[in-house]
Amino acid sequence: MAKKVVGEIKLQIPAGKANPSPPVGPALGQRGVNIMEFCKAFNERTKDMGSFNIPVIITVYQDKSFTFITKKPPVTDLIKKASGVEKGSDNPLKNKVAKLTHKQVEEIAQLKMEDLNTSTMEAAKKIVMGSARSMGVEIVD
């Protein structure tokens, strides 16, 4: 018989740096999950993912056990790393902060493909280019 799910928690936590302080502690504590057990498991699974924020979906069961799924880093984080900027433009229509090549866009789309809501590479590239445009990052050939 399958365990009864009592909740699902979605967080973004820096890779390899989960600790019991907010936002992790309060989110898990109110569901009765062993916070340190989650932190150790998450840090072990994400230790090689660099300094990205990693989206994680934690499923909590009635017996206070849990499972979690880690996703790829957000597209905006990948764009910032590829273009070498700290943050996007405050006015993306007027101020362009960086440039990305189509090859870099394709690499980001390839990496995020399994997390995106699309099945074709062309659609994935359009999603990445749209995110880049809204950050003030220009796409060049």
From Swiss-Prot:
Membrane-crossing residue ranges in chain numbering: none
Domain of life where this protein originates: Bacteria
GO cellular component, one term: cytosolic large ribosomal subunit
Post-translational modifications reported in the UniProt record: One or more lysine residues are methylated.
Single biological process term from Gene Ontology: translation
One Gene Ontology MF term: structural constituent of ribosome
Keyword field contains ATP-binding: no
UniProt entry keywords in alphabetical sequence: Methylation, Ribonucleoprotein, Ribosomal protein, RNA-binding, rRNA-binding
Function description: Forms part of the ribosomal stalk which helps the ribosome interact with GTP-bound translation factors.
Subunit structure, as described in the record: Part of the ribosomal stalk of the 50S ribosomal subunit. Interacts with L10 and the large rRNA to form the base of the stalk. L10 forms an elongated spine to which L12 dimers bind in a sequential fashion forming a multimeric L10(L12)X complex.
NCBIfam families membership: L11_bact
PANTHER family: 60S RIBOSOMAL PROTEIN L12, LARGE RIBOSOMAL SUBUNIT PROTEIN UL11M
Family stated for the protein in its record: Belongs to the universal ribosomal protein uL11 family.
Name used for this protein in its record: Large ribosomal subunit protein uL11
Organism of provenance: Helicobacter acinonychis (strain Sheeba)
Origin organism lineage: Bacteria, Pseudomonadati, Campylobacterota, Epsilonproteobacteria, Campylobacterales
